């Protein structure tokens, strides 16, 4: 199962040149760019690990691509994404986010039905990846 999170999630994986162009777009908008990674891509897991600090005031996409490559070397079997943060007053939110690396095998998710009181049906998404301990999931 292919994890679909962020911009471009339904397109084929971006090439490094396409990633560089998206980073250049973010820089042109004045957004701060950061790199994050995780081995638990659950849709509600919005707290991925940061790879270094956010890169404020960087004007060259090669600097950010270097950080992406270093993160890929360190975590080749993790999900890695690039985020662009718009710090404009009143917006102050992620403006762009896309996955730039994924494990070769994506185990996917299962939807579990849980019966509750008063015959209420609740549903829970469970990641197969979390059945293994952190650090050995892929």
From Swiss-Prot:
Keywords: Calvin cycle, Carbon dioxide fixation, Chloroplast, Photorespiration, Photosynthesis, Plastid
Self-association and partners: Heterohexadecamer of 8 large and 8 small subunits.
Protein name listed in UniProt: Ribulose bisphosphate carboxylase small subunit
Key word Transmembrane helix present: no
CDD domains registered for this protein in UniProt: RuBisCO_small (cd03527)
Gene: rbcS
SUPFAM superfamilies for the chain: RuBisCO, small subunit (SSF55239)
GO cellular component, one term: chloroplast
Pfam families on file: RuBisCO_small
Family membership: Belongs to the RuBisCO small chain family.
């Amino acid at each position: 199962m292919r994890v679909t999170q962020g911009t471009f999630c339904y397109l084929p994986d971006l090439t490094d040149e396409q990633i560089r162009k998206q980073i250049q777009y973010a820089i042109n908008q004045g957004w701060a760019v950061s790199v994050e990674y995780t081995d638990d891509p659950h849709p509600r897991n919005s707290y991925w690990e940061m790879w270094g600090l956010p890169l404020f005031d960087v004007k060259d996409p090669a600097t950010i691509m270097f950080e992406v490559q270093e993160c890929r070397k360190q975590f080749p079997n993790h999900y890695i994404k690039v985020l662009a943060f718009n710090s404009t007053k009143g917006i102050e939110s992620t403006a762009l986010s896309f996955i730039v690396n994924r494990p070769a095998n994506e185990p996917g998710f299962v939807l579990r039905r849980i019966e509750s009181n008063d015959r209420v049906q609740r549903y829970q998404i469970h990641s197969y990846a979390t059945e293994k301990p952190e650090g050995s999931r892929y």
